């Protein structure tokens, strides 16, 4: 077994006291902007946790494609594992981990589909090859071979060799509207800082609690 004790290093100094924040979205935006400058890969990557009909959890990395005070948005195939699980149980948890900053943000909330207009607008911004891939992929289904996938991609590419690629009807997005947002920052000797914002429903006022690490 690898001894990870020596991998621990001193937390970089940061300015300000994030525990003084009185609402979560502005704090999240500040942390995300700092992560964009610091993280080498995908600062908008987040772990998305859902639950299947048997109560067995699923988790996977996805990319957040937008956020505001209404919630956190991501896109995928509606018939994928995550899409089916969210249709059956529209609740989810998210985790952002920014290793370079020694920070993480945990989010729990209710999930609703984005509008067709939102999905269309985002899909139009994707590179054409990614748009073609969305048509060719039957996400979460069994795939015979990589060659079969490449054939499907080539077939779609030939169909849309000229002009715009429309959004597939089975591809859309979801918005996670949070009722819990927790901010955690590493400190020396595991004496970390941790605060949680909570509310019972969207639109209500947030309450803040400082938590033991």
Swiss-Prot record:
GO MF, one term, reads: pyridoxamine phosphate oxidase activity
Enumerate the Gene Ontology biological process terms: pyridoxal phosphate biosynthetic process; pyridoxine biosynthetic process
Q: Which cofactor does it need?
A: FMN
Membrane-crossing ranges are none
Q: Which InterPro entries match?
A: Pyridox_Oxase (IPR000659), Pyridox_Oxase_CS (IPR019740), Pyridox_Oxase_N (IPR011576), Pyridoxamine_oxidase_dimer_C (IPR019576), Split_barrel_FMN-bd (IPR012349)
Q: Name the pathway.
A: Cofactor metabolism; pyridoxal 5'-phosphate salvage; pyridoxal 5'-phosphate from pyridoxamine 5'-phosphate: step 1/1; Cofactor metabolism; pyridoxal 5'-phosphate salvage; pyridoxal 5'-phosphate from pyridoxine 5'-phosphate: step 1/1
Q: What class of enzyme is it?
A: oxidoreductase
Keyword Cytoplasm (UniProt): no
Q: Which cysteines are joined by disulfide bonds?
A: none
Q: Where does FMN bind?
A: 60-65, 75-76, 82, 104, 139-140, 184, 194
| Keyword tags | Flavoprotein, FMN, Oxidoreductase, Pyridoxine biosynthesis
Cited Gene3D superfamilies: Electron Transport, Fmn-binding Protein, Chain A
Please list the residues that bind substrate.
65, 122, 126, 190-192
What is the similarity comment for this entry? Belongs to the pyridoxamine 5'-phosphate oxidase family.
Q: How does it assemble?
A: Homodimer.
NCBIfam families attached to this UniProt entry: pdxH, PRK05679.1
| Role description | Catalyzes the oxidation of either pyridoxine 5'-phosphate (PNP) or pyridoxamine 5'-phosphate (PMP) into pyridoxal 5'-phosphate (PLP).
**HAMAP family registered for this protein in UniProt:** PdxH (MF_01629)
**Protein's name according to its UniProt entry:** Pyridoxine/pyridoxamine 5'-phosphate oxidase
Gene name, Swiss-Prot/TrEMBL? pdxH
């Amino acid at each position: 077994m690898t001894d990870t004790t020596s991998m621990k290093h001193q937390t970089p100094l940061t300015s300000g006291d994030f525990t003084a924040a009185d609402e979560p979205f502005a704090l999240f935006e500040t942390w995300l902007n700092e992560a964009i400058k610091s993280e080498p890969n995908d600062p908008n990557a987040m772990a998305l946790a859902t639950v299947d009909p048997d109560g067995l959890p699923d988790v996977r990395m996805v990319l957040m494609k937008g956020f505001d005070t209404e919630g956190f948005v991501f896109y995928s195939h509606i018939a994928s594992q995550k899409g089916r699980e969210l249709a059956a149980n529209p609740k989810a948890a998210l985790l952002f981990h920014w290793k370079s900053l020694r920070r993480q943000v945990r989010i729990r909330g209710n999930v609703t589909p984005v509008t067709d207009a939102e999905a269309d607008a985002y899909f139009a911004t994707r590179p054409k090859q990614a748009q073609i891939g969305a048509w060719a992929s039957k996400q979460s289904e069994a795939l015979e071979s990589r060659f079969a996938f490449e054939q499907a991609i080539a077939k779609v590419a030939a169909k849309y060799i000229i002009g715009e690629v429309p959004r597939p009807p089975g591809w859309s997005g979801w918005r996670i509207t949070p009722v819990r947002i927790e901010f955690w920052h590493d400190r020396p000797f595991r004496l970390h800082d941790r605060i949680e914002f909570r509310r019972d429903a969207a639109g209500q006022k947030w309450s803040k609690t400082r938590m033991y690490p």
